[in-house]
């Protein structure tokens, strides 16, 4: 995470809410030859985090039992020094909000995979209201069986979470106001204004 302590984010509940809202991670997996990255939906399951991958994913053979690092980015955007109140001797930067989840990956059974699919659907279909929500009941049993044959579910347990909220906290209130009024990400602008 960012080495400057003013950007540390230690609110575990807020980080979990962020992960739940984003619902997608880049999961870094060590191998003997080279690190690999799994791009996967992520859901909270108690103190752990669940994800699934295609059985054909080249990182899959290395997942079970591996110490992995999942990176969840809630937003990021370029910051121009022209937006600061004090423009002299300023350089461009990047603001972002990110959560790292470090833990041990463990293969889950089919029941956990089905529960994960249902949870993912429940969370993300709710954001699409007023459309009728998709549920697994809308798909034939044979289609579900085929899908299950193509993917595997994993849990990241024994978790350590770290967060960074780099939202121009190291700048003056006037500089932050300038960034918030110009930054391309409405979410980051809202977070900067809330500081």
Tell where the protein language model's regions lie, with residue ranges.
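Short, basic/aromatic recognition patches
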Residues: 1-26
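A generic local secondary-structure boundary/capping motif
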Residues: 16, 90, 143-146
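Short beta-strand segments
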Residues: 21-55
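Short, surface-exposed beta-edge/turn micro-motifs
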Residues: 22-24, 65-68, 151
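Pocket-edge structural micro-motifs
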Residues: 29, 53, 72-74, 158, ...
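Residue-level recognition of well-ordered beta-strand positions that form the cores
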Residues: 41, 52, 71, 104, ...
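Short, structured beta-strand-loop surface elements
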Residues: 55-119
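C-terminal edge-of-domain segments
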Residues: 106-195
């Amino acid at each position: 995470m960012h080495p400057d302590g003013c950007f540390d984010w230690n609110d575990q509940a807020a980080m979990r809410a962020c992960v739940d809202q984003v619902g997608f991670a880049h999961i870094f997996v060590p191998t003997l030859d080279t690190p690999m990255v799994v791009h996967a939906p992520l859901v909270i399951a108690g103190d752990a985090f669940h994800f699934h991958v295609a059985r054909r994913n080249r990182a899959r053979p290395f997942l079970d039992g591996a110490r992995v690092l999942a990176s969840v980015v809630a937003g990021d955007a370029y910051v121009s020094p022209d937006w600061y109140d004090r423009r002299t001797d300023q350089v461009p930067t990047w603001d972002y909000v990110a959560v790292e989840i470090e833990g041990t990956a463990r293969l889950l059974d089919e029941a956990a995979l089905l529960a994960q699919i249902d949870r993912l659907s429940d969370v993300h279909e709710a954001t699409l209201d007023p459309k009728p929500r998709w549920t697994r009941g809308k798909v034939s049993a044979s289609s579900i069986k085929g899908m299950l044959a193509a993917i595997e579910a994993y849990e990241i347990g024994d978790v350590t979470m770290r967060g960074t909220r780099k939202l121009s906290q190291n700048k003056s209130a006037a500089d932050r106001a300038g960034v918030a009024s110009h930054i391309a990400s409405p979410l980051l602008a809202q977070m900067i204004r809330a500081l």
